[in-house]
Amino acid sequence: MARRLATASLAVLAAAATALTAPTPAAAAPPGAKDVTAVLFEWKFASVARACTDSLGPAGYGYVQVSPPQEHIQGSQWWTSYQPVSYKIAGRLGDRAAFKSMVDTCHAAGVKVVADSVINHMAAGSGTGTGGSAYQKYDYPGIWSGADMDDCRSEINDYGNRANVQNCELVGLADLDTGESYVRDRIAAYLNDLLSLGVDGFRIDAAKHMPAADLTAIKAKVGNGSTYWKQEAIHGAGEAVQPSEYLGTGDVQEFRYARDLKRVFQNENLAHLKNFGEDWGYMASGKSAVFVDNHDTERGGDTLNYKNGSAYTLAGVFMLAWPYGSPDVHSGYEFTDHDAGPPNGGTVNACYSDGWKCQHAWPELSSMVGLRNTASGQPVTNWWDNGGDQIAFGRGDKAYVAINHEGSALNRTFQSGLPGGAYCDVQSGRSVTVGSDGTFTATVAAGTALALHTGARTCSGGGTGPGTGQTSASFHVNATTAWGENIYVTGDQAALGNWDPARALKLDPAAYPVWKLDVPLAAGTPFQYKYLRKDAAGKAVWESGANRTATVGTTGALTLNDTWRG
């Protein structure tokens, strides 16, 4: 849900410009084995299309979710996309032709498309929308008039009162009366128009602010039974409207999952995650959509976000490895102003440039999509933890994952259910040999993970591991540190974090004062890099001097023996 204020969601709604006839009532259709969605928040449709071809399809993502496509109020802020004024596809992110081209391109790459859909309300204020449509609150020519709005014309102010939550105005936005047949038909017409362009599913923004029966009636007019629905219904203890009410219509986003991941990764022990999911009181796994963060929560602070470094990355690794719910991988942009809209108006010229974070393409996360697909349907097996922040577990005989959220390396012999043989650790790009009894010995550096699966048996082509010509750079730097400090490396390659201190790679201090780390890089790659140190609070200090330079050899690993420059 798009929230202009921290406590409320901005949902922008919906009737359709083109009235299409809907066939049979639609049933919720879960994504299936490829159940990971990349949420490309505020990406232009042309940029989404390139991502489907270049990264999402090859990584094995099942879906891409795009931001609301309909015409909306003008303004640079991100939340303008969630204040619609019509149902023309004429927003900041592209027109109808660009949208259709994106859908076709993503389908060709094997990626289905989910459209974020705002059908609870319309924009407040007055003016001209991004597609040229004039509007004022309660009057949207050719679509809605005041008679189509709920009678309550004041803002929601009591979440303990069902009528207040579902009939009054979310942050002052014009609330549609979804109990009326005409309103339901117009909303369904908009969604059917998107289906006619090839859309495969919808995220229903602010579902909580519409009665579940109204959404059921609307969905019965949409599609042919194969449409995927994912509904935003934020859990609030003691509130009158609960997310579970919407399970009959489709999947529901389980916000408690993300909040609890933040608490565990920041204040508790990962060992507590052994029974994470339904045993924690969550909704049924098969009907839940989960995430580490989304566009609202990363700004509101109730979940982890990209500013939390390795905790954020490892939480994503865990989510993709753990068999609960259907995961969303949020992929947005850097911000200091919580209202700031997308860089370049949504055009992504390149990942990791202009502030685009591209979490969907981070090697630590994209490599886990293939693991999740391989392990689909497999139970958790061979759980191990140290009572603290080091855990490991298998997914039947298909996969095994270890996560080290502590400040020192984890070195042990792990018991997996994997068949014996060679595997690629898709987190590091290093080969791991599993014995005939399923055991293997490995070191997992602090703040990193290890991930093996039967779809990635070698690191030099095949499976989902690094491709042919992959070798590595072995960083060794002599650096003395104070208590609580650690040494990191970053550089001009995606595998090195693209000069982003938040994504810099932590070196292993096992041979202190020499810190070491092997990083997979393509053979023959020239690159620049530099070391930095971070204190316990995460404050970074760069070493002095110019950027260091090196080139990976065509065969074998490149070893760099450096000394910290004070």
From Swiss-Prot:
Extract the GO molecular function terms from the UniProt entry: alpha-amylase activity; metal ion binding; starch binding
Q: Name one GO biological process term.
A: carbohydrate metabolic process
| PROSITE patterns for this protein | CBM20
Enzyme category, top tier: hydrolase
Enzyme Commission code(s) on record: 3.2.1.1
Report the CDD domains cross-referenced here.
AmyAc_bac_euk_AmyA, CBM20_alpha_amylase
The segment(s) forming the CBM20 domain are 465-566
Q: Which residues form a coiled coil?
A: none
Keywords in alphabetical order, please.
Calcium, Carbohydrate metabolism, Glycosidase, Hydrolase, Metal-binding, Signal
Is the keyword rRNA processing in the record?
A: no
Classification via SUPFAM superfamilies: (Trans)glycosidases, Glycosyl hydrolase domain, Starch-binding domain-like
Q: Which positions are annotated as binding Ca(2+)?
A: N120, Q166, D175, H209
Gene3D superfamilies linked? Glycosidases (3.20.20.80), Golgi alpha-mannosidase II (2.60.40.1180), Immunoglobulins (2.60.40.10)
Residues annotated as signal peptide: 1-28
- Tell me the active site: D205 (nucleophile), E232 (proton donor)
The cofactor note from the UniProt entry for this protein is:
Binds 1 Ca(2+) ion per subunit.
Pfam families hit by this protein: Alpha-amylase, Alpha-amylase_C, CBM_20
Site feature Transition state stabilizer: at which residues? D296
Q: Which cofactors are reported in the record for this sequence?
A: Ca(2+)
Q: Which reaction does it catalyse?
A: Endohydrolysis of (1->4)-alpha-D-glucosidic linkages in polysaccharides containing three or more (1->4)-alpha-linked D-glucose units
> PANTHER family annotated for this entry?
ALPHA-AMYLASE
Q: Which family does it belong to?
A: Belongs to the glycosyl hydrolase 13 family.
Subunit structure comment from the entry: Monomer.
The protein depicted here goes by the name: Alpha-amylase
Its source organism is Streptomyces limosus
Upper lineage ranks?
Bacteria, Bacillati, Actinomycetota, Actinomycetes, Kitasatosporales
Q: Coding gene? A: aml
